[in-house]
Each structure stands twice: as C-alpha cells, then as structure tokens.
Amino acid sequence: GVDYRKVTGPARFLHNDTYLICDTALWNVNTNEIFAISNVKILQDQTVLTGDRLTYYVDRDLAEFRGSLVQLEDKDHNILRTEYLDYNTRDSVAVFFNGGSMKDKEGQIIESKSGTYDSKTKLFTFIDDVNMFTDSIFVKSTTMEYNASTNKATFGYATDAWHDDNM
C-alpha cells in the first residue's frame, strides 16, 4: 500500500537549505513526494516563492508550482508572476512557462512566454515573444537576458524598440 503522512498548519519541511511552508501537506513516503496545499511558500537564501499548491519531488530537488498566481521575489524585490513555475532547490533555478511577467525594482515590466531565473547569478532569461515596458520605451524581441544585479538587459535578434514621451 501507499504510505501517506499528513502534516497540518503550518507544515514545515527543510531540504537543500530550503524551507517549504504551507497550511497542509501530504507526504507520500513511498515516492518521496510532498503535495503542499494552501499558502505555499518556499524560502531559499533571500528568494521567496509563493503559490496555491505545489508538488515537491524530494529525490529530484524539484518543486512544481501550479495555480492562478505563482510569484517569485528575489532579495532586490524583482517580482516574477506566472501560473506555471518549476524550481530546482539544489541549483536555485526557476523555469516558467505558458506566460510570465516580471516587474523590476524600478517599475520596468518584462513579459514573455517562457523563461528562467538563476538565483545564484541573479540572471533572468526571457524566451519567445518578449516585451519590455518602461515609462517611455517599449521593446519587443525574441529573447532577452536581464541581469538583476546590474540592471542590464541584453536582447536577442529581431529586436524592435519604440520611444514615446507619453507612454
């Protein structure tokens, strides 16, 4: 049979120097998977991920967030929002897909269909249909890397930019 352990509020787990906190968790001891439900939070170093629910595959170091809003906030208050985000707790790398939006500490907004965030290097990579909005500039590109430490953006090929003082 399957051996489950139920942990209720607030449930706390520690793995790879990462805390998993939630209201309720079901731990499948046989497969070493944790199903976290309601007010789910992952805390690693100074990166915080929040969402409605996740499945944590302990042996693969992988947290799969799914829900209406999944949010990643780094120590510099750059905020990435999506509905689908996978986070590797060993490598400290997030992968988002099916659309995402990042707002940096200065208010710039970057959107794309998919991308990654490496919390060790503070590098966001945006892939496919990338749009960047500032108070006066709009940039559209196929890919973009954004270094959160230096606030430097590097665009891929097929990049177009517009400037308007009234944006």
Show which residues each predicted segment covers.
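Structural signature for solvent-exposed beta-strand/loop edge elements and short helix-capping sites
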Residues: 1-167
